[in-house]
Amino acid sequence: MNLEETMPLVFERSIPGRIGFSLPESDVPETNAGDYFDEAYLRSTPADLPELSELEIMRHYTNLSNHNFGVDSGFYPLGSCTMKYNPKINEKVARFPGFANIHPNQPESSVQGALELLYDLQTSLVEITGMDEVTLQPAAGAHGEWTGLMLIRAFHEKNGDTKRTKVIIPDSAHGTNPASAAVAGFDVVTVKSNEKGLVDVADLKKVVGEDTAALMLTNPNTLGLFEKDIVEMAEIVHAAGGKLYYDGANLNAIMAKVRPGDMGFDVVHLNLHKTFTGPHGGGGPGSGPIGVKKELIPFLPTPVLTKKDDAYTFDYNYPDSIGRVKPYYGNFGINVRAYTYIRTMGPDGLKLVTEYAVLNANYMMRKLQDAYDLPFDQVCKHEFVLSGNRQKKLGVRTVDIAKRLLDHNFHPPTVYFPLIVGEAIMIEPTETESKETLDSFIDTMLKIAKEAEENPEIVQEAPHSTYVKRLDETRAARKPVLRYQKEV
C-alpha cells in the first residue's frame, strides 16, 4: 500500500495560522535564551510544530483511535503474550492521588504507603513463585531475563568459576532468551526438542558440562506443553554446577497450582503486564520482577526494599550486588495494578485463572484439530500450536489466514513461532474470554479453512475490510520510517 493512501500525519494537516489552544498572558519577564545557552544549542528557525484547530486535532486523533485494536475491542489470542482483560478497578486504584502524585526523590518517610505496597507485592510474588526473595527493579520481561542472568554470572564469578560461559536454551524458546544471554556475555548452546515437543533429556545430558552457567526454560514451554521431566533436568544442571532459570512468560498456565521454586528453579522472572493484568501496548511500561533462591540474594540489584521495625526502607548494603539496573520505579503504576489484581483474586481466584486458561486452550485445540494440523497431539496448558501446512499445499499461507481473521474483527494469533513448527499458528485464549467468544473464533477459523479449499483467493488477498491492507513488512523492518521529515 502506498503511503499516499494512508491518513495524513498531523504535521501534514498543518495550516499556518491555525490555533488550537489559547494561553494566558505570561506574567514572567521575557529573557534571552542566549544568556543561558551556548549558540550551538539555540534554534536558528522556529520549531516546525503542527498548527491546527482544536476540532481538527480532536477528529484526527479520534479517527486514529478508531483504527486501533486492543483487548477492549475484541478477542486477542496472541500466543505467548497472555492478552487477558485488564480489570478497570486496577486503573481506579493506580489513579489514587497518593500513588499517582508522588515523586521518586521524596523522602522515604513521606511515601511509606507506596513502599508498603511494593513490599507486599514482593512478598506475594515470593509466595506465588516459591522463591526466597524478589526484586521489582527490572522494567519488563527481557530486562528481567538479563538481570537474572547477570545475577547468575555474578554468582559464578564470586565463586571463581569463570569457565562457566555457556547458557543452554531449548530450540523452542522465546527469541529474547538467546538475546538476553548474549547481552549478558554468555555463549548460547541449543538443546533439541524430542518428538513430543519437550526438551530432549538425552540431548541435555550431552550439552551440559563444566562450562554450563545455566539452563533457561519456559514451563510450560512455547508449544504450550508442560515439561514433565523438569525435576530430572534440574538435577542434571545442578549436578554440573549450573543454575536453572525460569522464563515466566507462561506462568498463567500454572499459577497457584505449582511453583517454579518447587521444580528446582534458582531464578525466575515474571511479566506483571501479562500474567497480572498490567496493560500491554504503547511500548510500555511493563514490569519484569525477578525472584531468586537464597544463595543468589547477595547479588540482587540495589537498593533492596526491606522492612525494618515498622518502616519500609531501601537497603544499599549489598557489597556483592550487581548494582542498579534501573534508577527509579517509573513503572510504579503497573506494580499497583498487579498488586490490586492479586489482592482482588486471592489464592483461590488465581487458581481459577489457571484452570480456565488451560480449559479454554484445550477446548479450542480440540475444536480445531480436524481442520488444521496439530503437530503435538496431547493435552496442552494455556496455549497451543497449530500448523497451516495443510493449507499451504492449497496455496494459502499462515500469514493469509492471519490477515483473513482481521476481516472478522479478530486479532490474529502469533504466527511462524515457535520456529520448530512449520507455518505455526500459536493461540492463547486466556481465562477471561467467554465460551461464546471462543466459539465465534473457532467458527471463523473453520470457515477460513473451508475457504482455503474452495475459494483460496479470498484468503490470499485478505484483509478486505480494514483501513490498511497489506504492507511491505520486510521493508518496514529493514528500512523503518520512524519520524516525520518535511519536504523541502
From Swiss-Prot:
Name of one Pfam family that matches: GDC-P
Enzyme class: oxidoreductase
Reaction(s) the record says it catalyses: N(6)-[(R)-lipoyl]-L-lysyl-[glycine-cleavage complex H protein] + glycine + H(+) = N(6)-[(R)-S(8)-aminomethyldihydrolipoyl]-L-lysyl-[glycine-cleavage complex H protein] + CO2
Keyword Oxidoreductase among UniProt keywords: yes
Keyword list, A-Z: Oxidoreductase, Pyridoxal phosphate
EC number in record: 1.4.4.2
Cofactor(s) needed for function: pyridoxal 5'-phosphate
N6-(pyridoxal phosphate)lysine modifications at: 274
Cellular component aspect of the GO annotation: cytosol; glycine cleavage complex
Function according to Swiss-Prot or TrEMBL: The glycine cleavage system catalyzes the degradation of glycine. The P protein binds the alpha-amino group of glycine through its pyridoxal phosphate cofactor; CO(2) is released and the remaining methylamine moiety is then transferred to the lipoamide cofactor of the H protein.
Family stated for the protein in its record: Belongs to the GcvP family. C-terminal subunit subfamily.
Name of the featured protein: Probable glycine dehydrogenase (decarboxylating) subunit 2
Organism: Listeria innocua serovar 6a (strain ATCC BAA-680 / CLIP 11262)
Gene that this sequence comes from: gcvPB
